[in-house]
């Protein structure tokens, strides 16, 4: 099964509550999305591999650590764009690629309409950024695109998620022996229903999120 990590950090919980408050103004909402994204970026990258390197300090030569894995950010258009800035605060060198999806009105299946991925991946880890994991359709479809592209480690990073969305993620066709290594879902809070006020505010700030579900 996929590993689900729900943040319990007091700052995340505090800011998430303000984010979902119906009285939060759009400008403040955007700021909170950026701030929460930065906080969960710290948690979502806790398992990145590092390697040793030597360098000189003002006093002596020493051995330290640097990231071994290159990271790519994949915001699902358009709602995921609001999370990119928060991640860039911690990893300014991360490359960003965009994948656009919309839901077919007849089949209710996600349809890819935008994909500007390079011919071959230049990173070892891809983080799918999407604030709200609703049915899991767009997240699963994005993961499938990245798998076909050749990425070996994929993580979903979001703000809130529904149980339905969580359950949908294991249906991705992944080698079961490597499931936990390949697909890890990071969310701030698991909710029984999608929060309407959050959806409306996402609509205000990032465009029609229903078009990418």
Protein language model regions, located:
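PRPP-associated nucleotide enzymes
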Residues: 1-213
């Amino acid at each position: 099964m996929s590993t689900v990590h729900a943040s319990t950090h007091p700052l995340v919980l505090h800011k998430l509550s303000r984010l979902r408050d119906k009285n939060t103004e759009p400008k403040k909402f955007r700021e909170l999305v950026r701030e929460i994204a930065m906080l969960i970026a710290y948690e979502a990258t806790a398992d990145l591999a590092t390697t040793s390197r030597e360098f000189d300090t003002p006093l002596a030569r020493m051995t330290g650590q640097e990231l071994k894995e290159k990271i790519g950010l994949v915001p699902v258009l358009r709602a995921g764009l609001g999370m990119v800035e928060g991640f860039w605060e911690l990893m300014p060198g991360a490359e960003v690629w965009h994948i656009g999806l919309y839901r077919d009105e007849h089949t209710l299946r996600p349809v890819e309409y935008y994909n500007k991925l390079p011919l071959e991946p230049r990173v070892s880890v891809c983080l799918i950024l999407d604030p709200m994991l609703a049915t899991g359709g767009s997240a699963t479809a994005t993961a499938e695109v990245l798998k076909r592209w050749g990425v070996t480690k994929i993580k979903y990073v979001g703000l809130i998620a529904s149980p339905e969305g969580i359950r949908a993620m294991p249906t991705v066709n992944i080698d079961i022996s490597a499931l936990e290594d390949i697909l890890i879902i990071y969310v701030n809070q698991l909710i029984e229903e999608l929060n309407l006020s959050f959806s409306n505010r996402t609509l205000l700030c990032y465009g029609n999120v229903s078009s990418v579900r």
